[in-house]
Swiss-Prot record:
Species lineage: Eukaryota, Metazoa, Chordata, Craniata, Vertebrata
InterPro entries tied to this protein: Ig-like_dom, Ig-like_dom_sf, Ig-like_fold, Ig_I-set, Ig_sub, Ig_sub2, IgLON_domain, Immunoglobulin_dom
Lipidation (GPI-anchor amidated asparagine): 321
Organism annotation: Homo sapiens
Keyword Membrane attributed: yes
Gene name of the record: NTM
Keyword field contains Transmembrane helix: no
Protein name: Neurotrimin
Amino acid sequence: MGVCGYLFLPWKCLVVVSLRLLFLVPTGVPVRSGDATFPKAMDNVTVRQGESATLRCTIDNRVTRVAWLNRSTILYAGNDKWCLDPRVVLLSNTQTQYSIEIQNVDVYDEGPYTCSVQTDNHPKTSRVHLIVQVSPKIVEISSDISINEGNNISLTCIATGRPEPTVTWRHISPKAVGFVSEDEYLEIQGITREQSGDYECSASNDVAAPVVRRVKVTVNYPPYISEAKGTGVPVGQKGTLQCEASAVPSAEFQWYKDDKRLIEGKKGVKVENRPFLSKLIFFNVSEHDYGNYTCVASNKLGHTNASIMLFGPGAVSEVSNGTSRRAGCVWLLPLLVLHLLLKF
């Protein structure tokens, strides 16, 4: 309902009918603009929702009566207001100009407005079209989503506005990779862990600043041990074995030696777990502690393991792809003693 959708005062009903006859603007009859040098209304008027629209009509001293109409309903006739909408006010009524203002414009105000005048000869009309622009607004967007690696996802971002806004999707974290879609819908087939992170939906139509919303996409995948560190430690010293694993959800770690799980606090051993890292700490290394240890990382999607060596001084540990193995030992002191015995 536009500015014309308000009731008229009952005592003016007869005058309304008279004015319609006077100005010859019956409902449904098209009105042409520019049939004469006057009245001359503005070209199309474009305003943003919430702003004020001024409708001006240029006239001259030959005019005896003048009115502004919204479609076929009179808003103002001369100085008299026929519309009860408080947003419609008279700005000027002079020999050269007849203007009204519609305040706090809304989308239902959009449409044709007619300036109608009466001269000594016959009525004349001129029309202007009011265009209402609306800032973009995102009315529907997908919720944050958690999905297993390899599955397909579809993200939705619905926006309204006048003109119709352009919607774009962009992957912004963990690192920006530019625009990935210029559509309301973003389809990702066989999603990978690298495609996790925040996705930004932007709606713009040049009426106001773009509107931005974000969706967080979490990609779940089984653990992958990216680093497994063995170490050489003398007897009686502190030693640490490290196992680092990438996983979503975060991996849970367990340590084993000779197929037996190591329990924290037993035999001077401590297990220190963080979301992506586990440490097996020996406070006082003994000969019995040397050997091969297994780090197991697991989450709800799977598990993996790596072999890590704790060795003594002089031993060489070869580490590859999260596993370590003993390559050999060279004990320098026994060789030196043997050399001295043979010499003498």
